[in-house]
Amino acid sequence: MKATLWGGLCAGVLLLTSASAQVLKPLPPIRTASGVVAGKVLASGVKAWLGVPFAKPPVNDLRWMPPQPIAWQGVWNADRKMPECMQVLRPHDINHYFGEEATGEDCLYLNVWAPARATAYSKLPVIVFYYGGGGTIGSAGSGMYDGEAMAKKGAIFVNIAYRLGILGYMAHPELTREQGGHSGNYAGLDQLAGLKWVHDNIARFGGDPAHVAITGQSAGTGAVSTLIHAPLAKGLFQQAMVEFVEDG
């Protein structure tokens, strides 16, 4: 089963879209390291937790800063996707590809889909996906990156938002001075923070933190290539699938 799952992923991951799903019922709350989250069951039986925060909103004093840990009181209602990260205006001829979504700086959220049979500590394989868009556009909330179809095949599917454009990649001498000698890789740090969230919490959703594969599309594949070589990502994933990245 697992061999079939991993072997078919590269050919099929970009086709894993699903129609709008009717919500059948809410899910019992799950306690994560940051706080309690409540998801929902889709019409297919797939369990979904949408718009789960993995870092504090990167606004005001946290703009152009590494992502910071977040915690909350009460129950976070993870029943809808959150706004995409701020990005450049897309050409009209590709709007049909990405779709129209709300945008905002408060965008460091991830989405989790799990099979209907998943329970805490089921130890199912986990796929973490990073979206493409050249580092200037893209969204974890895009319908073409929806994880419902993959969850129906037996895997936990997670996609992670990260900052884009000038908010994700700007290096500046003053920022470098403030941040101890480096600046300009906030998007990469977001990608790492989301992956660490998966490592720390995915078992509670039915995933196996010792069986995590990372993958992505276009710029997302570039993120995967970076994480393969990143010392800070050591131990956070066990497999990587590089599907496509443009050279230069």
Predicted regions and their residues:
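Alpha/beta-hydrolase fold nucleophile elbow
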Residues: G206-Q217
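Bacterial N-terminal signal peptides
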Residues: G7-T17
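Positively charged n-region of N-terminal signal peptides that target proteins for export
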Residues: M1-L5
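Non-catalytic accessory segments of hydrolases
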Residues: A19-N185
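A conserved short beta-strand
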Residues: K234-E246
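Alpha/beta-hydrolase active-site loop
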Residues: C107, G181-A203
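Active-site loop->helix "elbow" adjoining a glycine-rich segment at hydrolase catalytic centers
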Residues: G132-G133, Y186-D190, S218-T221
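Short glycine-enriched nucleophile-adjacent loop
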Residues: T221-L232
